[in-house]
């Protein structure tokens, strides 16, 4: 029995997400199963623009951007699970619960985001996310997103 891996390269990610540099925080999808899970990677470079001020002499990847990277991974999973959006629709980051930061992420790290689908209720989908560096948890959170027409 073989296990099939589903990967997405940057060109496919750019077709799914509206984010662009410097706010695109997913470099590659390593594996996913529609409606279940997605594993993606962000290669953290010292050339990221926010490292100039966060923090001079001790660059640390901002925690809020770790959460955003996980949220972008949930967006890709949602798109691959339910299809592309109609014109005028967006997926909105609707909420976050139980966010915890365990250790810093620094230049040179390869951050792996693992997100799993939990449930959809009243148009809001809940995902569990974890970010890892070298197999160690750096952040975990429960995130919600909603599909909606632009205001």
UniProtKB/Swiss-Prot annotation:
The active site is at 54. It catalyses: a (3R)-hydroxyacyl-[ACP] = a (2E)-enoyl-[ACP] + H2O. Transmembrane segments: none annotated. It is found in: Cytoplasm. One of its GO terms (cellular component) is membrane. Keywords: Cytoplasm, Lipid A biosynthesis, Lipid biosynthesis, Lipid metabolism, Lyase. This is 3-hydroxyacyl-[acyl-carrier-protein] dehydratase FabZ. The lineage of its organism: Bacteria, Pseudomonadati, Pseudomonadota, Gammaproteobacteria, Enterobacterales. The gene is fabZ.
């Amino acid at each position: 029995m073989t296990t099939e891996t589903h990967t997405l390269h940057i060109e496919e990610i750019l077709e799914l997400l509206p984010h662009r540099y410097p706010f695109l925080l997913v470099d590659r999808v390593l594996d996913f199963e529609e409606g279940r899970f997605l594993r993606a990677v962000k290669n953290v470079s010292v050339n990221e623009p926010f490292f100039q001020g966060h923090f001079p002499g001790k660059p640390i990847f901002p925690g809020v951007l770790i959460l955003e990277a996980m949220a972008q991974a949930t967006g890709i999973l949602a798109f691959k699970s339910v299809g592309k959006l109609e014109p005028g629709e967006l997926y909105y980051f609707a909420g976050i619960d139980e966010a915890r930061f365990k250790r810093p992420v620094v230049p040179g790290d390869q951050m792996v985001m693992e997100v799993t689908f939990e449930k959809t209720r009243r148009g809001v989908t809940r995902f569990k996310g974890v970010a890892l560096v070298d197999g160690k948890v750096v952040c975990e959170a429960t995130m919600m997103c909603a599909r909606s027409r632009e205001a």
